[in-house]
């Protein structure tokens, strides 16, 4: 069964990022990032309000990014957004795992994030540290254009890419 609402959401808000291999700045080991869909935009207050039924932001505005939320609240948002679109939530936020993040893989297997296979998850989630660095440095396109190791995103000269 096709989920038309999910497809509409993905078409409007998501973008596919091609994965690849690289050596993150914090380790000497090469790591692999798998192809992944990520939101094109920061989570807006309007989207947060629709899912969480509250808006704790200090700087109000439907199209402004949500702020003043905790990391745990962001995980809860991901789970609720997953449920809204009929997807299996990624995070086990049950009381038994309070203060300890656990990942729910498909089939009900609950594992620690450091051994989780995110290809075996279905719902929305936050990017891992390795994925986040991959995005920030330009990913596969930056490797192909030989800009991946620039000091700043897009250049070694901060004046060319910042204000």
Predicted regions and their residues:
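A short, compositionally biased domain-edge/stem linker segment
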Residues: 1-9, 107-114
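Intrinsic disorder/low-complexity segments enriched in polar/small residues
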Residues: 3-6, 11, 152, 161
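A short glycine-rich, aromatic-capped structural motif
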Residues: 5-57, 62-83, 135
């Amino acid at each position: 069964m096709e989920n038309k609402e999910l497809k509409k959401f993905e078409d409007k808000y998501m973008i596919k990022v091609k994965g690849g291999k690289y050596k993150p700045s914090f380790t000497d080991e090469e790591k692999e990032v798998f192809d992944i869909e990520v939101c094109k935009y920061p989570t807006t207050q309007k989207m947060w309000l629709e899912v969480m039924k509250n808006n704790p932001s200090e700087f109000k505005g439907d199209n402004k990014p949500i702020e003043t939320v905790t990391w745990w609240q962001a995980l809860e948002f991901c789970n609720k957004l997953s449920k809204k679109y009929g997807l299996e939530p990624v995070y086990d936020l049950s009381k038994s795992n309070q203060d300890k993040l656990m990942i729910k893989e498909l089939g009900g297997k609950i594992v620690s994030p450091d051994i989780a296979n995110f290809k075996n998850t279905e719902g929305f989630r936050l990017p891992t540290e390795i994925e986040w660095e991959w995005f920030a440095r330009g990913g596969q396109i930056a490797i192909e254009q030989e800009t991946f190791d620039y000091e700043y995103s897009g250049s070694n000269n901060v004046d060319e890419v910042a204000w």
